[in-house]
């Protein structure tokens, strides 16, 4: 049998009158005897303080304060302590023989409130030889000791091996240890439990029937049915949570679209503005850089323009200075050209008239001769024509009768004969007998030459004849011409002078003929001289442009160098053009590629976002479309496996739920019908009787009763035999056992207990062997243990089922997401990153732009060098051909020499011009001067002979020509032979006729032509004479005008003058053109400089403004980025696909979202205000604040009982997965959690029956208690009538009130309260809520009325009240009640504490002198029977015979107060025995 724990001693350290006193406590009764003020109450106060160290409860009052409403301010504790550290310690030993010292350290706190500081502690493992006073005191000398502080006590105990010291910060922990170690009977979990315990101790201490206990006796005696209540609370909490969750799901379902809409629109609103600002910031940075580049370029351009302006202004000044002289020279050259042209025109007229006169003179002379010859020829022709006419007429008459025609042979014969005759005539005339037709052509050339020679000789003689004929008239004319040229001379000298003049005229004419070559030579030399001067000017200008003086010898080498430079630069320029074209082509290709990639980038980004979401959801990285499709197949397989596993877990969970429901039946009945049968038979279920069996005993009893563990125990089997007839609504096997349910035991069977098994001898010939079940369910503890394990398993299964359901739905949604991804993005998701390619291409584009700029600069420099080189080469090309001119130093001398020669030639030309006509007239008639008249006859003969020779030669040539012409006729010999005989006469006639007709025709024609010619010649002669006279007059006028002009007019003068004028005009035009160009260039340069200056000012202003804007925007942007990163929304706002939209598109997107958001947040004042503030375009961070506010608002709206995330976007995604599953699961859970009203009534009724039985058992222990006239004490328990009606309605008439219990708007407690109000409308419920009333109705203790009754004298049983009993009777009755309460607490706490511990039982009784000896003996007997310790305080006249008695005497010695204590053992029946150590007086010493 388990020994009960005992209090061994009480130790007081530094209390008022007790410095270090240990009271050994008796196992039964310890009596404190002493007079008033001896310290009895102080000792008990120290015990109570160590037992309940709660200053809110402790209140030590004396009997004079019993009716007072308030006691002393220190609650009676402050005044009982001495200054310094005080201790109160209880030394106990529990059922396990463990020594435990518990206590408190007390210390007065200075102040008018007289507070006390309490620190509880516990010491375990202390050896039995160590006394408590040795722990907390330190001996200084024989008469002095010091109290240790709590820290010093801890250090001291730490040095002791095996000793554990615990200090507690809460009273709950302190009492929890005392309960676990068996020091107190009840676990004091709360302040309410401590208050009950203190009220019990207080009632025990001061004695009597405590109204605080009797009024709430149900709370003390009836244990709280925590299991049932907890089950109801859990059920209602679960139902409430279930309904709240379902409501939350419904709210969430309604909010889901709002969430989506709000998040979507807020994201579009803020992200569009965020990305627009990001784009604008990038654009502004690019613009600022572009402004800066353009600013530097413009500054360079302005500097170049300024240098260019200075050069052009200097050059313009030079050209302005040269223009005046050029204009004067040009005007002089123009005037000279006009004079030369006028002179030339006059000279041309003169020459033309002179030529015309000469021609007219010749024509006139020739015409005179022609007219004379024509007249003679006319006479001859007339005579010849008449003779020919006569001959033709005669021949025609002879041939009138002859045949008129011949055939072809005759014609050929004629032609042959003519050819033969012509050949013969040629031989005869030419004296060539060997002449043949073949050699006729050669001879023809010879005779034609002879004819020509004879003709020339004839003409010469003819001329001489003519001269001779006119010699007389011409001699005088020739003489006059010689005299006009030479002056007067003798006639005999005329021939010699004429010849000399003709020779001199030839020389002069030769010199005159050299005028033009000399003039040309002079013009050429002058041109060369001008070219030399121009070359010198060009050389000077070239040296000036080159900035260096060059020698003539260096120009060729420089030309070659420049040519080579031009060639290289030309190649560079041409290659540069190709390179530039290639670069521009590549740039265009890059731009086109970038545009294509920018169009493709949003699609790719959307695909990547979808792919990243899939990767985040599945935790996999995909690198190809094949991996996606393979993972999709794996996903399908995983989904099938998860569905199978979920269904298996769901089946197991349902089985566990069914088993829990079966085990949760009241009374342990697995079948509801057993409860109805037990009520019908008036019995009790066996499992209900053994409901309190311990967990250790459950296997034994389960095996003992075997199948009959669900039997019904009835008082009498014979009374229910009739009820068994026709019984159908019952289990297949119904066990009935006869016995008293109030005193039933297991003696009905003969049992042999084996190892983990029993053998039950049911009858002599029937045994049953039953092993202990591994999982017993017999008894409430076993069922609760099994239910607890099943609940744990169910929680695991539920969690696993929820996880699997979540995984299944997640997998299904993931499968849908994969399907959408494959359908929409698979084709582009695994292509190369277009943004990386865009960055690479942009880098390449920047390189190309930089290369193009560098190339353009280099090309510009090369072009400039090329132009300079070309200009130099052009100048050298003009100079090089003139190098010899530049080197010719004698050119000017040669010009002077030629000028002198030209002057001589011009003098000769003037002579020829003056006497040329006379010389020309003299020359043909000069021979007249040498001829004399006597030579005329000889000339005549020579002329005749020459004429005959010429005629013969002409005939010979004619005959040979006829032979040559008739060479083809010599082949017609055959035709001649045929016609030779008969056609001779005819041929002759014809020949003569033909000759005559020909002659006649010639004569006529000649006559006509000569007649016409004669008339024409006469007319021409008249017109020539008239023209000659007119032009002679005009010639004289023109010569006078030419002399008036005074300009030498030669053939090259006009050309030289024009060339000079044109050169000067070209120079002037070039100068003016260059000046105009320079003026225009200067104007353009000044305008360009002004434009550049304005542009520079504008660029500087724009650059500074843009830079300030960039800097300002950077600060704002940094604040925005900091806010974005601090709130973790960058991933939501930085949507890269929006970077490819324009600012207008983003602004439109933001405005549309803003309009939608205004409607969405119209009902939310906070979001509406934040949205209104965010509309400020100058404060972009406010949009971020709005976005964060939206997220915070949505986080607050997220139901954390459904969605375990702070991210609203993830919450929406999880909602989609969770809502349908939770709705289905919670609906089924609500159906399972709901409990029927009948079950509630049965549970409450069974609990009431069980507690009534327990109270009856407790009453058995009170039957022998008697005090004075009180013979017995009992507890009376009854069910309240209103509550009994409620139970009946719940059991039998619940169908009438299903409107309450089936309502989803009411919890079960509220429905129960509504039913109670419906059944008892007369009861006023006050301000309590239905939930509170319902919870009270679920507590079975509220159904019971409990009161204490005493059997007193002749009054019989009456209610125990202090007014009806004497003081002693009331003290005894109250003490009896307290003992029963303690025993009830122990029974209640037995299941919570280890079974090997029986707690300590101790009560107090102050002022025990009011009890008589018989009553005190009754208390002693009660303590002995209940193994209870009792501490009583009594005056000195109390001397109990049993237990231990301490005599306390308070003494004062030298202003020092102390209590003298003497302890005595009980003296009956033994002699009194003095306890060791009790004779020594306590001598307090000063604390050192």
Curated annotation (Swiss-Prot):
Alphabetically list the UniProt keywords.
ATP-binding, Cell cycle, Cell division, Chromosome partition, Coiled coil, Cytoplasm, DNA condensation, DNA-binding, Nucleotide-binding
> InterPro entries from the xrefs?
MukB, MukB/SMC, MukB_hinge, MukB_hinge_sf, MukB_N_dom, P-loop_NTPase
Coiled-coil positions: 326-418, 444-472, 509-602, 835-923, 977-1116, 1209-1265
Record-level Gene Ontology MF annotations: ATP binding; DNA binding
- A GO biological process held by the record: chromosome segregation
Record-listed ATP binding positions: 34-41
**Name of the protein in its database record:** Chromosome partition protein MukB
Taxonomic path = Bacteria, Pseudomonadati, Pseudomonadota, Gammaproteobacteria, Enterobacterales
């Amino acid at each position: 049998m388990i020994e009960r724990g005992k209090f061994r001693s009480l130790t007081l350290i530094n209390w008022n009158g007790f410095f270090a006193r240990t009271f050994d406590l008796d196992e039964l009764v310890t009596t404190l005897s002493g007079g008033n003020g001896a310290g009895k109450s102080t000792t008990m106060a120290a015990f109570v303080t160590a037992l309940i160290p709660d200053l809110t409860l402790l209140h030590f009052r004396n009997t004079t304060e019993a009716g007072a409403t308030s006691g002393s301010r220190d609650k009676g504790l402050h005044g009982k302590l001495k200054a310094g550290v005080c201790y109160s310690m209880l030394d106990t030993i529990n059922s396990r023989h463990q020594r435990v010292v518990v206590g408190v350290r007390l210390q007065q706190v200075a102040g008018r409130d007289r507070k006390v500081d309490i620190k509880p502690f516990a010491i375990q493992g202390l050896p039995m030889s160590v006394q408590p006073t040795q722990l907390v005191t330190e001996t200084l000398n024989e008469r002095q000791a010091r109290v240790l502080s709590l820290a010093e006590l801890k250090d001291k105990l730490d040095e002791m091996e095996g000793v554990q010291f615990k200090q507690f910060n809460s009273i709950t922990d302190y009492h929890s240890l005392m309960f676990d170690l068996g020091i107190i009977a009840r676990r004091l979990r709360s302040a309410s439990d401590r208050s009950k315990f203190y009220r019990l101790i207080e009632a025990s201490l001061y004695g009597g029937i405590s109204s605080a206990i009797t009024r709430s006796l149900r709370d003390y005696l009836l244990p709280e049915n925590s299991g049932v209540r907890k089950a109801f609370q859990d059920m209602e909490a679960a139902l409430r949570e279930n309904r709240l969750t379902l409501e939350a799901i419904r709210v969430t379902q309604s909010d889901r679209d709002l969430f989506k809409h709000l998040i979507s629109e807020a994201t579009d609103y803020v992200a569009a503005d965020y990305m627009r600002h990001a784009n604008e910031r990038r654009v502004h940075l690019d613009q600022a850089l572009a402004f800066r580049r353009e600013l530097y370029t413009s500054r360079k351009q302005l500097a170049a323009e300024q240098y260019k302006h200075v050069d052009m202004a200097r050059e313009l000044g030079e050209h302005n200075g040269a223009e005046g002289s050029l204009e004067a020279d040009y005007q002089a050259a123009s005037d000279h050209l006009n004079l030369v042209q006028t002179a030339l025109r006059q000279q041309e007229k003169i020459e033309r008239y002179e030529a015309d006169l000469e021609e007219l003179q010749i024509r006139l002379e020739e015409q005179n001769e022609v007219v004379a010859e024509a007249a003679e020829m006319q006479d001859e022709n007339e005579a010849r024509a008449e003779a020919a006419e006569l001959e033709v007429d005669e021949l025609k008459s002879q041939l009138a009768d002859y045949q008129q025609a011949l055939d072809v042979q005759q014609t050929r014969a004629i032609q042959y004969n003519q050819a033969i005759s012509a050949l013969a005539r040629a031989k005869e005339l030419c004296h060539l007998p060997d002449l043949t037709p073949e050699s006729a052509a050669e001879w023809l050339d010879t005779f034609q030459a002879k004819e020509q020679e004879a003709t020339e000789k004839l003409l010469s003689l003819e001329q001489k004849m003519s001269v001779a004929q006119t010699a007389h008239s011409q001699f005088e004319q020739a003489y006059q011409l010689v005299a006009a040229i030479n002056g007067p001379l003798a006639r005999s000298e005329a021939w010699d002078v004429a010849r000399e003049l003709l020779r001199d005229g030839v020389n002069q004419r030769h010199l005159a003929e050299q005028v033009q070559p000399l003039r040309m030579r002079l013009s050429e030399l002058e041109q060369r001289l001008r070219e030399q001067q121009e070359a010198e000017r060009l050389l000077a200008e070239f040296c000036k442009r080159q900035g260096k003086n060059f020698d003539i010898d260096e120009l060729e080498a420089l030309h070659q160098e420049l040519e080579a430079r031009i060639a290289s630069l030309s190649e560079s320029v041409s290659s540069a053009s190709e390179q530039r074209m290639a670069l521009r082509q590549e740039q265009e290709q890059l731009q086109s590629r970038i545009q294509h990639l920018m169009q493709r980038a949003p699609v790719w980004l959307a695909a990547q976002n979808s792919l990243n979401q899939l990767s985040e959801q599945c935790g996999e990285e995909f690198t190809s479309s094949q991996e996606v499709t393979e993972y999709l197949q794996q996903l399908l397989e995983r989904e099938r496996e998860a569905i199978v596993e979920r269904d298996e877990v769901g089946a197991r969970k349902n089985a566990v739920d069914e088993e829990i429901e079966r085990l949760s039946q009241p009374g342990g009945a697995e079948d509801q019908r057993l409860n109805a049968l037990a009520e019908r038979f008036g019995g009790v279920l066996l499992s209900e009787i053994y409901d309190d069996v311990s967990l250790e005993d459950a296997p034994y009893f389960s095996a003992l009763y075997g199948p009959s563990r669900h039997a019904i125990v009835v008082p009498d089997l014979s009374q229910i035999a009739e009820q068994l007839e026709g019984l159908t609504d019952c289990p297949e096997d119904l066990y009935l056992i006869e016995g008293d349910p109030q005193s039933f035991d297991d003696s009905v069977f003969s049992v042999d207990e084996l190892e983990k098994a029993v053998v039950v001898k049911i009858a002599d010939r029937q045994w049953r062997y039953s092993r202990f079940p591994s999982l017993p369910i017999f008894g409430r503890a076993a069922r609760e243990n099994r239910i607890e394990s099943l609940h744990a398993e169910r929680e695991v299964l539920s969690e696993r089922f929820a996880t699997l359901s979540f995984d299944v739905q997640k997998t299904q949604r993931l499968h849908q997401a994969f399907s959408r991804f494959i359908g929409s993005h698979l084709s582009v998701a695994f292509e190369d990153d277009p943004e990386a390619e865009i960055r690479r291409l942009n880098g390449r584009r920047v390189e190309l732009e930089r290369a193009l700029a560098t190339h353009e600069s280099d090309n510009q420099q090369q072009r400039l060098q090329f132009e300079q080189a070309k200009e130099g080469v052009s100048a050298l090309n003009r100079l090089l051909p003139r190098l010899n001119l530049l080197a010719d130093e004698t050119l000017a001398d040669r010009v002077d020499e030629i000028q002198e020669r030209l002057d001589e030639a011009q003098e000769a030309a003037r002579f020829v011009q003056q006497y040329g006509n006379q010389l020309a007239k003299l020359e043909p008639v000069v021979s007249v001067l040498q001829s004399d008249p006597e030579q005329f006859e000889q000339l005549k003969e020579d002329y005749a002979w020459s004429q005959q020779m010429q005629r013969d030669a002409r005939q010979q040539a004619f005959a040979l020509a006829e032979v040559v012409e008739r060479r083809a006729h010599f082949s017609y010999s055959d035709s001649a032979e045929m016609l030779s005989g008969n056609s001779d006469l005819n041929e002759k006639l014809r020949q003569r006729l033909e000759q005559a007709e020909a002659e006649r025709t010639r004569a006529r024609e000649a006559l006509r032509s000569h007649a016409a010619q004669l008339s024409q010649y006469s007319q021409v002669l008249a017109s020539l004479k008239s023209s000659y006279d007119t032009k002679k007059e005009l010639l004289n006028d023109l010569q006078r005008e030419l002399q008036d002009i005074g300009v030498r007019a030669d053939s090259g003068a006009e050309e030289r003058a024009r060339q000079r004028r044109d050169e000067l005009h070209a120079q002037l035009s070039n100068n003016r053109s260059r000046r105009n160009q320079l003026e225009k260039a200067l104007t353009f340069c000044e305008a360009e400089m002004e434009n550049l200056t304005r542009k520079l000012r504008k660029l500087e202003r724009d650059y500074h403004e843009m830079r300030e804007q960039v800097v300002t925007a950077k600060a704002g942007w940094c604040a925005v980025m900091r806010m974005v990163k601090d709130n973790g929304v960058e991933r939501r706002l930085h949507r890269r696909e929006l970077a490819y939209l324009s600012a207008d598109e983003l602004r439109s997107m933001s405005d549309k979202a803003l309009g939608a958001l205004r409607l969405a947040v119209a009902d939310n004042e906070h979001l509406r205000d934040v949205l209104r503030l965010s509309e400020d375009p100058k404060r972009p961070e406010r949009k971020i604040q709005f976005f964060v506010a939206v997220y915070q608002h949505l986080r607050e709206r997220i139901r954390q009982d459904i969605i375990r995330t702070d991210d609203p976007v993830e919450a929406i995604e999880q909602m989609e997965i969770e809502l349908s599953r939770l709705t289905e699961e919670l609906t089924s859970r609500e159906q399972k959690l709901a409990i029927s009203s009948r079950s509630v009534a049965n549970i409450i009724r069974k609990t009431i029956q069980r507690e009534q039985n327990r109270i009856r058992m407790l009453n058995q222990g009170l039957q022998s208690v008697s005090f004075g006239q009180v013979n017995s004490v009992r507890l009376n328990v009854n069910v309240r009538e209103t509550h009994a009606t409620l139970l009946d309605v719940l059991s039998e008439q619940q169908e009438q009130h299903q409107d309450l219990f089936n309502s989803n708007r009411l919890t079960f407690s509220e429905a129960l309260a509504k039913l109670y109000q419906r059944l008892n409308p007369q009861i006023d419920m006050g301000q309590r809520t239905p939930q509170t009333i319902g919870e009270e109705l679920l507590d079975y203790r509220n159904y019971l009325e409990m009161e204490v009754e005493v059997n007193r004298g002749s009054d019989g049983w009456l209610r125990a009240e202090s007014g009806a009993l004497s003081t002693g009777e009331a003290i005894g009755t109250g003490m009896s009640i307290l003992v029963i309460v303690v025993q009830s607490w122990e029974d209640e706490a037995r299941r919570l504490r280890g079974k090997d511990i029986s707690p300590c039982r101790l009560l107090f009784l102050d002022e025990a002198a009011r009890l008589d000896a018989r009553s005190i003996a009754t208390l002693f007997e009660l303590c002995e029977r209940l193994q209870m310790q009792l501490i009583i305080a009594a005056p000195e006249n109390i001397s109990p015979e049993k237990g231990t008695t301490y005599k306390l005497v308070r003494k004062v010695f030298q202003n020092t107060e102390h209590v003298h204590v003497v302890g005595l053992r009980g003296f009956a029946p033994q002699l009194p025995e003095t306890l060791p150590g009790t004779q020594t007086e306590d001598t307090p010493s000063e604390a050192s």
